[in-house]
Amino acid sequence: MNNQGGDEIGKLFVGGLDWSTTQETLRSYFSQYGEVVDCVIMKDKTTNQSRGFGFVKFKDPNCVGTVLASRPHTLDGRNIDPKPCTPRGMQPERSRPREGWQQKEPRTENSRSNKIFVGGIPHNCGETELKEYFNRFGVVTEVVMIYDAEKQRPRGFGFITFEDEQSVDQAVNMHFHDIMGKKVEVKRAEPRDSKSQTPGPPGSNQWGSRAMQSTANGWTGQPPQTWQGYSPQGMWMPTGQTIGGYGQPAGRGGPPPPPSFAPFLVSTTPGPFPPPQGFPPGYATPPPFGYGYGPPPPPPDQFVSSGVPPPPGTPGAAPLAFPPPPGQSAQDLSKPPSGQQDFPFSQFGNACFVKLSEWI
């Protein structure tokens, strides 16, 4: 059967044929729709086994429309898929190219592709198993599986190159294939136009596929750029989302966290009493706020309830629950002892300086 462009008028491509279907049974089936002048089933050159597709040519080109209007078609217990063969010079260009695909132009000898894209490959399927499976559609000349550059493990998709285009047509016609118990998607791979297309992801060479440009099918292997880090369960977490209830992770898009609480400083002078261990009774412990975040600073005329009594004379302040030291009135408690430097509260946040010898 000739494959010249003018000879494709009135011709059907028939895919999904059973392995037992012969040219005689194929011709006999389609003869009910009109006179068949030519019929062929494509076979493997080595094993002479049917490759599962063929071509039928009618004397009257109008018979093609009759066949298409009579779908579905079943032959030898299997659903077959007849499609019209449009001469290459008459193939319409796409008005809107799909994402990640170039505008389709009349194909030349140099732009013909015998390559298919295979997505959703099982993790336990290697190049040998892929080649063995796709050999049923024709001679496989190359198998390329895309690997993660860092982890050196398959990313779940790859490319198969056949010896001829008829093998590509047959493989793509099935669309979904069952490989090692998993549904695998097969699409035709088109060579990119290097002048009009930006380079694809690493490992894609010059071949494009929608799955390489979109995360919808889950084959890109990379999460969106707005996602950072891992949750304790190993799942991707959006930037700023809390992980385990501990607030925003440090270094993931937020400012450095401030100290969780202001230091409490206690100064002592030599005396008969040992230095205090920890904080004096009744004085503050760190406030119960989450990691790295404390309460907002109080206004200048207010004091936080950190357990440290406010200076006497402050409006609204409660009276002290203990007497002042000998020789000093309650009004003088807000002043630093003589000979001591006065440190403003604003310099150390909510810290309070207390000289223990004044309270003993």
Curated annotation (Swiss-Prot):
It comes from Xenopus laevis (African clawed frog). This is DAZ-associated protein 1. Component of a mRNP complex, at least composed of DAZAP1, IGF2BP3-A, STAU and VgRBP60. Binds to the 3'-UTR of Vg1 mRNA. Interacts with profilin, a protein involved in actin assembly. Interacts with VgRBP71. The keyword Cytoplasm applies. It is found in: Cytoplasm. One of its GO terms (biological process) is oogenesis. RNA-binding protein, which is required during gametogenesis. May be involved in the actin-dependent anchoring of Vg1 mRNA in the vegetal cortex of the oocyte. PROSITE patterns: RRM. Residues 10-97, 114-191 form the RRM domain. Keywords: Cytoplasm, Developmental protein, Differentiation, Oogenesis, Repeat, RNA-binding. Residues 91-112, 184-195 have a biased composition (Basic and acidic residues).
